[in-house]
Amino acid sequence: VEPILSPCSGTVERIITKEENHVHEWEKLLLIKDSKGKIIDVSIGISGVITSLNVSEGQEVNPQTVLAILQADLYGFGSD
């Protein structure tokens, strides 16, 4: 189980994924608008299933905010 933390302080602009979705490495999960107005893509470097989404659109977040929980795949995919 992997917590997905916010990479910055800001506001959740858009939630792209849903609970129970299988996501791939580096797939966009959410968009956060930081304090300077820049849109930050949130992704994670492992694949798995989103077991919990802990935020909603418009919510204020900071680097300690757990955005979602991912159950990592037991097998890896990769490319060289």
Predicted region positions:
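Short histidine-centered loop motifs in beta-beta connectors
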Residues: P7, E13-N21, T51-S56
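Short phosphate-engaging motifs
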Residues: T11, H22, V49, E60, ...
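A structural signal for short beta-strand/turn segments enriched in small hydrophobics and glycine
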Residues: E20-L29, G58-L67
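Short beta-strand-turn/beta-hairpin segments enriched in glycine/proline and small hydrophobics
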Residues: V1-S9, K28-S47, A72-F77
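Short, charge-rich amphipathic interface segments used for partner binding and complex assembly
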Residues: I44-P63
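Preference for bulky hydrophobic residues occupying beta-strand positions
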Residues: I15, L30, V42-I44, L53, ...
